Amino acid sequence: MASEVPYASGMPIKKIGHRSVDSSGGTTSSALKGAIQLGITHTVGSLSTKPESDVLMQDFHMVESIFFPSEGSNLTPAHHYNAFRFKTYAPVAFRYFWELFGIRPDDYLYSLCSEPLIELCSSGASGSLFYVSSDDEFIVKTVRHKEAEFLQKLLPGYYINLNQNPRTLLPKFYGLYCVQTGGKNIRIVVMNNLLPRSVKMHIKYDLKGSTYRRRASQKEREKPLPTFKDLDFLQDIPDGLFLDADVHNALCKTLQRDCLVLQSFKIMDYSLLMSIHNIDHAQREPLSSETQYSVDTRRPAPQKALYSTAMESIQGEARRGGTMETDDHMGGIPARNSKGERLLLYIGIIDILQSYRFVKKLEHSWKALIHDGDTVSVHRPGFYAEWFQRFMCNTVFKKIPLKPSPSKKLRSGSSFSQRAGSSGNSCITYQPLVSGEHKAQVTTKAEVEPGVHLGCPDVLPQTPPLEEISEGSPTPDPSFSPLVEETLQMLTTSVDNSEYMGNGDFLPTRLQAQQDAVNTVCHSKTRSNPENNVGLITLDNDCEVLTTLTPDTGRILSKLHTVQPKGKITFCMGIHVAHLALKHRQGNNHKIRIIAFVGNPVEDNEKNLVKLAKCLKKEKVNVDIINFGEEEVNTEKLTAFVNTLNGKDGTGSHLVTVPPGPSLADALISFPILAGEGGAMMGLGASDFEFGVDPSADPELALVLRVFMEEQRQRQEEEARQAAAASAAEAGIATTGTEDSDDALLKMTISQQEFGHTGLPDLSSMTEEEKIVCAMQMSLQGAEFGLAESADIDASSAMDTSEPAKEEDDYDVMQDPEFLQSVLENLPGVDPNNEAIRNAVGSLASQATKDSKKDKKEEDKK
């Protein structure tokens, strides 16, 4: 709701977010801009009188305040605005940041205060205002109280990170201030400017790596330069953006390091802001008075801050060399699209000032992740970081493949056409496993017509095969081997991390192609049955167990990306270790399946493979093998291995042979490894919907609802056993017999059903809106539904569960409806405008206020 505050004229005006509007609807931010410049002028001047010294911890908590009356004072000049107070947070610490980025205090002062700040028309959804300095060097943004508070807590760690590595895509903060006027606190932060106004931006994206509700709204599209989102990017640029290999490696390395920093602070839901300048389009555009400044008409002013451009923010060595034909990158990262057009990319990570614990309170309850809250708090930011990096480095940014020589093109084209056949169309054939003369083999064939990519000479349809790559370029290749069960699966993935894993015949390398395929397999298996578990084992000489069996695919993927090529593949030993890992955890209704990715020559002879297959057959173990990259060497051996496993039935185990191509994961989709023997894709909505939730639409919700109900069932059974044992002890009856305990459990269960269990919500009978309301109530009321106490959790180790923190967090969330609204907008499946949710938020806010008043009264009585 809009509130009314007095302003300079004495007339009440409306206040929406940080933006003040008068009765005519016009924005009146000139007073705010003037107050900011007056305050910064005084702060920089007073800071120059302080001696330079090492930064101490107390410097991060220092707050300086100065009052600016309208008539002026001994320390402040007179002005025509309302009287205001200006606060400066951690001035000494921020002075160190200036020095780190090569900014002199007089340059900082001149940029921000020599000329009026320029207001940008694109304000945030929360009502935040954006100003840019006249020289395009700095951005001034208004932030919420929670964001400013979080930045204060972030500063010590931020200081350490920048001290170790000033080249980062994270926001570079140069100052945090607060203007107190008219009974309101307006907090502002000064940052580096990612998008210079001197370069015309043709399109802009805000990317998270998610597809849920990630499309620009119609209102956003009507803006002069709209900010598009992930689905728009996948539609507009499906092939991604192509960078030189050195630039791509430097960018991905910087993203990985920055995401690790954000993960350590438990920050998630950040985005990559990317604005694209098309050099070829700019040269063809006619110049006019209405056109924005083009590249040729106005050059950027000299930079005052180091490492402030996108190109400087990644590795410095990537600035030299490469194949891009631009004379002046103007701070942008050179790239190409699939048409071969030259681009300049201006990128940076944004929206990092949101504490993860508030989102966790709502989102985790909505997802019904009840137990092991501390583990979830640590792993979910890690999973988000892993997902974010994967999307950026594999989908958004890609390497420009090397050009083979004409003679090598001829050789690769002839060998490729022999694989593809004469039709010229893509085809996938599957031959079922049978004993005898039939071989168990799946082959993916594809042929690319010549001339398809004539518009993009630097983007090739196929990377040259291994034998045609120069000797100086290492080419390792990945392989994995997972374990799966048919009804309830416990999957151990055996990863081939031998020396062949860097080969580039699978894009971008065998190792990364394997990682994407393992990701697809693990998600398919866990979605087909939420009780399935997955493990990860390497197939190198050591056969290292990276993760034990777990349903957390985020943990699997996190470990997966730490694998580096080394040594040789030990196929037999790896399969044996995977079998032992599964056998140790096998349940009565579990079937064991191993899925092995093999991307290196198998040195084990056929005799040993057949012997191993016979042993596995006795143990009723099925093995699926994805053979890629070395099909000519491995196919005969692995076919004999799989045929021995299948025996006379000819079913159960599978061998998939995939020749080099653009996507290993896509080649597996239609095969029985994912689709099952019946051909229905596992984990993609083929089964009936439990709890009224489509697993393909929201797999996480389907999983956690099932886990939640299973945990409740187990808890009730355990309580029934304890109660039965206590009753038997009182009656003097021995409790050693299993039949007696089972009877007691049955009676207790029947008794509970008769009298009902009032502490737990009945999710099966709730509508979607009621489930959302219930989740919000659970998140803010703690243990009311019997969810806070668990014998498996050490209460002292759980995060944010202490009572004082709970009261403070709940109070802050409920007293900041704008923040709560922004959190709800980012939750999957939640419509914040739904009447049921709005009523729930209102009732929770009023309840939180009543509880706080009640607690204060009790404290006063004491």
From Swiss-Prot:
One GO CC annotation: cytoplasm
GO function term, MF aspect, one: 1-phosphatidylinositol-4-phosphate 5-kinase activity
SUPFAM superfamilies assigned: SAICAR synthase-like, vWA-like
Compositionally biased intervals (Basic and acidic residues): 850-862
Regions that span the bilayer: none
Keyword Repeat (UniProt): yes
Biological process per Gene Ontology, one example term: phosphatidylinositol phosphate biosynthetic process
Keyword Cell inner membrane: no
One Pfam family it belongs to: VWA_2
VWFA domain mapped to chain residues: 490-673
Tissue: Testis-specific.
Keywords: Cytoplasm, Repeat
Domain PIPK: 28-396
Biased composition (Low complexity): 412-424, 722-731
Intracellular or extracellular location(s): Cytoplasm
Main location: cytoplasm
Region Disordered, annotated ranges: 404-424, 453-481, 716-740, 826-862
UIM domain location: 696-715, 766-783
Role, per record: Has negligible PIP5 kinase activity. Binds to ubiquitinated proteins.
Additional comment: PIPSL gene appeared in hominoids by L1-mediated retrotransposition in a hominoid ancestor of a readthrough, intergenically spliced transcript between the PIP5K1A and PSMD4 genes.
Name the record gives this protein: Putative PIP5K1A and PSMD4-like protein
Gene behind this protein: PIPSL
